[in-house]
Design a protein with these regions (language model features):
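Short, well-ordered coil/turn segments that N-cap beta-strands
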Residues: 9-13, 47-49, 75-80, 106-108
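Active-site mouth loops of central-metabolism enzymes
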Residues: 16-35, 82-93
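N-terminal small/glycine-rich loop or linker at the start of catalytic domains
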Residues: 5-28, 109-113
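N-terminal catalytic cores of secreted or lumenal carbohydrate-active enzymes
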Residues: 81-82, 99
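Short amphipathic alpha-helices and their capping/turn segments at secondary-structure boundaries
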Residues: 1-7, 94-105
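Acidic (Asp/Glu)-rich catalytic clusters
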Residues: 67-75, 97-108
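Catalytic domains of carbohydrate-active enzymes, especially glycoside hydrolases
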Residues: 35-57, 101-109
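Glycine-rich, proline-tolerant flexible connector loops at the mouths of alpha/beta enzymes
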Residues: 48-74, 82-91, 112
Length: 113
């Protein structure tokens, strides 16, 4: 089986890649928006199942823009995931800007920490 004809097989390992978020936290690493788009396309070409695109929130404009542009990437295999946190105890979830940003990313998958 090659990456170009990957199909779901029960018991098969699925890959969830967090390079665009967690990898960007390494010392000396700062992905540009163009870097993030190219990496996402290459991960899709490799057959990665899930790509964590980043942490869209009002204080992170690069990741917000990535998710805006990601909708038009035309990924063939991979599904994008947005990463974020639950609502803070002191806020009404309907008023939480970070939760709203996760929804605005319009991904099928959201990873919550």
């Amino acid at each position: 089986m090659t990456a170009t004809n990957l199909k779901y097989i029960p018991g098969m390992v699925e890959i969830y890649d967090s390079t665009l978020r967690d990898g960007a936290q390494a010392e000396g690493i700062s992905f540009s928006l163009e870097d993030k788009i190219l990496i996402a396309q290459k991960l899709d070409d490799f057959g990665v199942h899930y790509i964590e695109g980043g942490y869209p929130n009002p204080t992170n404009p690069k990741d917000m823009e990535f998710f805006e542009k990601a909708a038009s990437l035309g990924l063939k295999k991979a599904k994008l995931a947005a990463f974020g946190s639950t609502c803070r105890a002191s806020l009404d979830p309907a008023e939480d800007r970070n939760l709203r940003a996760l929804l605005d990313a319009e991904t099928e998958i959201v990873t919550i920490f």
